[in-house]
């Protein structure tokens, strides 16, 4: 998989994001569940999550926010069950072939996906139970 993270970083360095271009996350109503990994090779997910958290800390909002950033998890920070549903055969092999961090840190990436599965299930069940 081609790493595009540098492309995103270079693009933002050449044209810093203006206020008008920011996504107004403070206007989101409901639960905002942000998940990313430091070793995302496609874009700097952790930076963007931190940026959204900072914006929410500075702006009035009514959304409930849960943000989780894993050291290892690659760009595929899917819940483990979802990944196995999408790729019932060979999901672990695919992730290892697509992302070098998954090959280097397979246990950590798997642990992150299992934790994401647990957290997302809890968020969805909490939402369902409030209805």
PLM features: what roles do these ranges have?
Residues 1-23, 100:
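Mobile cap/lid helix-loop segments that gate and shape the active-site cleft of serine hydrolases
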Residues 38-43, 74-77:
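Acidic catalytic loop of the alpha/beta-hydrolase fold
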Residues 28, 33-40:
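Short beta-strand/loop motif that positions the catalytic acidic residue
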Residues 21-27, 130:
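Surface-exposed acidic, glycine-flexible loop patches that form ligand/cofactor-binding
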């Amino acid at each position: 998989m081609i790493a595009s993270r540098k492309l995103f970083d270079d693009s933002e360095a050449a044209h810093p994001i203006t206020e008008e271009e920011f996504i107004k996350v403070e206007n989101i109503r409901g639960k905002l569940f942000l998940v990313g990994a430091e070793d995302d090779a496609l874009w700097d997910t952790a930076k963007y999550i931190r940026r959204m958290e900072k914006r929410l800390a500075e702006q009035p909002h009514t959304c409930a926010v849960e943000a989780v950033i894993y050291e290892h998890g690659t760009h595929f920070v899917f819940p483990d069950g979802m990944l196995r549903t999408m790729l019932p055969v060979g999901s672990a092999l695919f992730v290892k072939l697509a992302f070098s961090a998954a090959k280097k840190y397979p246990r950590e990436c798997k642990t992150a996906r299992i934790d994401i599965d647990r957290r997302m299930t809890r968020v969805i069940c909490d939402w369902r139970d409030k209805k």
